């Protein structure tokens, strides 16, 4: 009986110490059509999650659960014509709205990766707002 009580106590501590980290992204765009493509990257610039979600009322909400605590980055674009890619002009400049976490912009290319990093920790949901331009 004492072994069973110890086991139950151990399991209880496991649930208390386990963290279910949640990040919710509110993505705002200029138009009410197409889909938002979003990539979540870890601090090593490796893709850990991806999502494609329809835009409704010029907004898309994406929620990732069961993340590990740490630093992450997001890049997103609004595929307005539903062709599955970010359209660019002949010079490689995007013709569709795009954005990064922390709403940073780069000069003549994407921003420095370090500037897009944000922290996920604790027992509460982290909410990130990204404006696509």
What are these regions (language model features)?
Residues 60-66:
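Exposed aromatic-hydrophobic patches
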